[in-house]
Amino acid sequence: IYTYAKVDFKKFGLNHWQKIDFSLLGRILSISCFTMVQYFLAMATWFVFFIAIERLGQRELAIANIVRSIYIVMLIPVQALSTTTNSLVSNLIGAGGIAHVMRLIWRIARMSFFIMIVCVAIVVLFPHAMLSVYTNEQALLVESVPSLYVIAVAMVIASVANVYFNAISGTGNTQAALILEMGTLVFYTLYILWIGMVVKAPVSVCFSIEVVYYSLLLLSSCLLYTSDAADDKA
């Protein structure tokens, strides 16, 4: 309805059906297929995480589910700004503003960081209030607090890491983004299997994988940008 009311159909060629351009479709798939695999792998590792937590016991699984619920809520602004970065980087490159891409990424990352600092401050200052939304059991609330603090640290790093990482896909280099994600997720999977199934560490220690994951994602993304900048100068 919005498209019909607001968009100029003739300007964008929407006023008539066009033949399927298989060459264009192939080019789109050659870029998007890496993104599809990337998202699939990211979701699959969460499955592995909860398998490892389940081996620790039902109590630990309950803690993980509660903390994960808060984690997902905190991810909303981060994911929103990361997706925005992807779109704006693509638009800026299309407009010929390649020289301004890094400045744009930095500005969005800074905004994301400060928003997350506020969110984390609320969570850290009022952990029981946040957790009580999901359970009224006092003992479970107390046991969930350490894991919540770990996630709070992870989200501060994620606020910057996700912006820089999603900007890579915005440049069209989805293959590089997939390689970075795969490398990080391999470490993620091995770490959680070891710490959860072999060491059988507490839930809060298991959640430390999120800190490691986002740190590696940020580091690898920055290294890629540094490498590309060096290649451009050469």
Language-model region placement:
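Short membrane-interface helical motifs at transmembrane helix boundaries
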Residues: 118-141, 145
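Hydrophobic faces of transmembrane alpha-helices in multi-pass small-molecule transporters and flippases
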Residues: 1, 17-48, 73-77, 81, ...
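Helix-terminus/linker motif at the lipid-water interface of multi-pass membrane proteins
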Residues: 40-73, 91-92, 129-138
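Alpha-helical transmembrane segments of multi-pass membrane proteins
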Residues: 26, 70-74, 138-161, 190
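Conserved small/polar residues in nucleotide/adenosyl-binding loops
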Residues: 225-230
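Small-residue-rich hydrophobic transmembrane alpha-helices
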Residues: 63-125, 158-177
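Residue-level recognition of pore/gate-forming positions within transmembrane alpha-helices
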Residues: 69-72, 185-186, 211-214
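Alpha-helical transmembrane segments of multi-pass membrane transporters
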Residues: 1-3, 119-123, 179-203, 216-224
